[in-house]
Amino acid sequence: MKKWLDEEYPAISARAKAENAEIHWADETAVMNTDVRGRSYSPRGVTPATRSVWGARQRFSMISSVNNQGKCYWMIIDGVFNADRLIVFMESLAKDAPRKVFLVMDNLKVHHCKPVKEWLEKNKERIEVFYLPSYSPELNPDERLNADLKHAITTSVPRRTRQGLLKKTTEHMKMVKASPERVKTYFKDKHVAYAADSQ
């Protein structure tokens, strides 16, 4: 982690400035209607309990990226997250970004599997990928977006259907994308302050 903060990331940041590239941080998360967080109340000595939502558990995945200029990109994934879906996301990100993208992600196996490496080699003029140190999610600003989304879902009326969960997720993510100042607050956490002024 120290090497990342003292050497690796400063080198990435310097390259981004020299090449007029944007640095984005990406991550995947599972979105579920059974994720219970927040506060509750019960009499002293009694463990608080919450009711689970009616019906079957609903779940899907989302991949997203943020940068310290307040930009946010996201994609809902119905089914298993794999190389093909990662490539679709990176293609969309590279297409929409006005400059070359330096994408920082964790070391999930799919992030550097053969199909992804081959695609990146063909598109290296538009996008490059860099990897965070292993077991260091706290260094990724996109983790704050994930926490923001899950807080929004778990503090609202429970979503009992897949469609309801998808609707709430989409509404929240559209709001985040349209709120650059909100995205910038993700970079105020002490663990990711290193990334706040790097481009």
Predicted regions: what they are:
Residues 1-199:
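Short functional hotspots at interaction and active-site rims
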